[in-house]
From Swiss-Prot:
Keyword Repeat: yes
Domain (KH-like): residue spans on this chain: 351-435
Known partners and oligomeric status: Associates with the 50S ribosomal subunit.
Residues annotated for GTP 2 binding in this entry: 181-188, 228-232, 293-296
CDD domains xrefs: EngA1 (cd01894), EngA2 (cd01895)
Pfam families listed in its UniProt record: KH_dom-like, MMR_HSR1
Protein name, per record: GTPase Der
Keywords: GTP-binding, Nucleotide-binding, Repeat, Ribosome biogenesis
Family annotation (InterPro entries): AAA+_ATPase, G_ENGA, GTP-bd, GTPase_Der, KH_dom-like, KH_dom-like_a/b, P-loop_NTPase, Small_GTP-bd
PANTHER family: GTPASE DER
Residue stretches spanning the membrane: none
Residues involved in GTP 1 binding: 10-17, 57-61, 119-122
Amino acid sequence: MKKKIVAIVGKPNVGKSSLFNRIIKEKKSIVDNKPGVTRDRIYSNAEWLTREFILIDTGGISVDQQLFSNEIQIQTQIAIEQADVIIFVVDFLNRLDKDDKIIAKILHKSKKPVILAINKYDKKTIDEHNYEFMNLGFSDLYFISSTHGIGIGDLLDKVISYISKNDVELKDDSTKIAIIGKPNVGKSSLVNSLVNENRMIVSEIEGTTLDAVDISFSYNKKKYIVIDTAGIRKKSKLGQTVEKYSYLRSLSAIANSDIVLLMIDATKPITDQDTNIGGLIYDEKKPVIIVVNKWDLIKNKQEQILKKEEEIRAYFKYLSYAKIIFISALDKTRVTKILDLIDEIKQSLSVKVKTYVLNEVLNKAQLINPAPEFNGNRLKIYYASQVQAYIPTFVLFCNNPNYLHFSYKRFLENQIRFSFGFDSIPINLIFRERK
C-alpha cells in the first residue's frame, strides 16, 4: 500500500513544528518562538490507527532569513504539489492576517484535501472571532492545542479518513525501483537505457526533468517499475528551496519503492547533498545499490576504481551493505548488470531463517563476544525469531533492552548478516524484554 504524504502548512510561528512533534511523538524539529526557526529535519514517518504516512513540516523549507509573502507562497505551492493531504495551521490567539489569507487562497485553487487546524486553543478562551476562521472557506475545521494535545486525535482521524479514501491493493509482482540522486547525475539517461526508449528529454542543463514519472518495462521475463526523480526545474525564485524540494520528492519515491538506486557522478567529488540523500535511504531501511555513472569519462579506470570505492565507503558508512556498480548510462555500459544485482537482492530478501539456527548463531556470538556492561548491567539474549516483514526483521528477547550498547547491536547485526547471506541488504533487529 502506497505511503501517503501529509504536509503541515502555515505562516511562521503558528505552531507547525509543535504539531509535527506532537504527531510523530518525538522532538525532531527545533521549536522556538522566533519566526522561521525550523530547520533541516522537515519530514518523518508517522502512524495513527495502524496507518503509516509521511509527515512534512513545510516550515523547514523556508531558508530565507527574511520572511516575505512570496516565500510563504513558494512553500505552500511545494506542499500542494507533494502532499496527498494538507493540514493548514492558523493561530487561534491572533487574528488572521494577509499571509493566512494568501495561503488559504492558494490552497483553494488546489484539488488537495485541506484540514484547517486552529492551534493554541485552550477551551477557556472566548471564541469571539471563530467566524473569521469559518470565512476561510474550509469545511474541515479542528480547534487544537499542539502543546497540550487538545483535539489532535480528532484531527488525525480526519487525516486518516482522507489518505485511506483511495486505497486500492493492486496485485502487481513488478519490482519498484526508485532512482535518486542530485540533479544532472544521469538519472534520466539511466531510465532511458533501462527501458530502451528515449522517453525523457536528456540534456546537460541541470534539472530538465519536470516531474517524477513511473515507467514499466520487462527484462528476462521479469517486470519492473522505475520511478525517476530527476532534477526539478530550477526557477530562480525558488533559490535554495530547490534542494529541499528535491528531498521531498526523493523521500516519497524511496518510501514507495522496493529497491533504491542511488546515483552519483564519477567525475565529481561526493558532497553533503549526496550523503543527505543517502540518509533518506538509511532512514527508510531500503535495499540500495550505489550507481556510479559517467565511468566512461574516467581515465586509468582500473587504478581509479579502488579509490572511488574507498571514497564511497568512507562517505556512506551507514550504507555499508550497499552494492556498488560503475556504469555509463549513455553508452549503456553495465546497465543490465544493475537488474542482475536487483534480482540477487530480491533473493536475499526472501530468505527465511529457521528459529533454531538463528538462536545457535546468537548463542555462539554471545560466547565469542559477550555484551559489554552498559547502563549498569549486561545484555543477555534468551532467544530470537524472524518475523514477517519486507526486509529481514528479527525480534530478540532479552533481559532489558536498555542494556544494549549500539556497538553490540552492530556486532549482532553483522553476525546475522554474514551467517545468512544478508550482506547486501539492510536488516532490522528489534529488542524486547522477556516477560
